[in-house]
């Protein structure tokens, strides 16, 4: 597929401090065939004025205007997805910064995929570097690249290895995902699971996004959720609910192996079961011994 038009979705809310830098990083991409669709979620600061300014400055930027009010982070992105018509859609946070070749690298990856892969739900994602509020790199990789390169392992049940602002999905994935299931709490995790069950996940082993950490960004501000994810709380309750809901909704579409994996996962994460029994069952998944031992402690 040559020179595909990309759609970038940005959900904004009170982002006046950093959003100009992110918009500029998108405008300065080496790959130029894109459009940026933004929906503001009721900002109380100067975010909307900044968006209006950029919309006038670049015809590829479109600000959605509706009367739906504040939907919250997740529903804001869902609303944006309903307005995405292009074959390939990327997600942008308002406070990150994209390296200028990010889109170029994604298009290069698309060009190397065969028709069969492109005809199914597809998720392509890269890595990011963790930065402070001045975009100085604190850590070169946000995602464990060794884990992310694992394509045929069932370890994804217990690992968060997809970050929304580094992700791109195709139209097949969007059709599969919306409206969001009731138990979706993180859209990136949702797309990750759907790609594993129904399509393909492709990892670009480069940090093409500067992921800015500060006191007000969506994940960074939610300390309890960040702790559960980054400290690898292996039985994150909401994740279990989502996987169970996917099983119930798509039972007839899931492959036999995936159904078996889900059943094992639900057994291992069933807190009503004996911990030693769950530890024994956990050998089915490719987890290190230390992680399996955490079953006995955190389960």
Question: Where in the sequence are the language-model features?
Answer:
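Nucleotide-sugar donor-binding/catalytic module of glycosyltransferases
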Residues: 1-223
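C-terminal subregions of glycosyltransferases and related glycan-biosynthesis enzymes
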Residues: 157, 178, 184-185, 197, ...
């Amino acid at each position: 597929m040559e020179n595909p038009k990309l759609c970038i979705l940005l959900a904004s809310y009170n982002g006046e401090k950093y959003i100009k830098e992110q918009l500029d990083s998108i405008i300065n991409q080496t790959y130029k065939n894109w459009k940026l669709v933004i929906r503001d979620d009721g900002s109380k600061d100067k975010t909307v004025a900044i968006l209006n300014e950029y919309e006038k400055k670049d015809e590829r930027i479109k600000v959605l205007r509706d009367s739906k009010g504040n939907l919250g982070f997740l529903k804001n992105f869902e609303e944006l997805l309903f307005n995405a018509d292009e074959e390939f859609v990327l997600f942008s946070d308002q406070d990150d910064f994209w390296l200028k070749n990010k889109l170029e690298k994604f298009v290069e990856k698309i060009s190397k995929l065969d028709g069969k892969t492109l005809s199914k739900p597809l998720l392509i994602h890269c890595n990011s570097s963790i930065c402070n509020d001045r975009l100085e790199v604190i850590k070169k990789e946000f995602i464990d690249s060794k884990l992310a390169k694992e394509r045929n392992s069932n370890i994804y049940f217990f690992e968060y290895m997809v970050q929304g602002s580094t992700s791109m999905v195709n139209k097949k994935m969007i059709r599969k995902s919306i409206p969001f299931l009731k138990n979706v709490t993180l859209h990136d995790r949702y797309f990750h699971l759907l790609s594993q069950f129904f399509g393909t996940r492709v990892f670009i082993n480069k940090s093409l996004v500067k992921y800015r950490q500060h006191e007000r960004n969506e994940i960074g501000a939610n300390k309890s959720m960040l702790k559960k994810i980054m400290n690898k709380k292996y039985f994150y309750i909401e994740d279990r609910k989502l996987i169970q809901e996917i099983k119930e909704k798509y039972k007839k579409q899931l492959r036999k192996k995936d159904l078996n994996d889900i059943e094992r996962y639900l057994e291992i994460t069933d807190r009503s079961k004996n911990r030693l029994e769950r530890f024994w069952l956990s050998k089915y998944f490719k987890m290190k011994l230390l992680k399996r031992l955490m079953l006995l402690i955190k389960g």
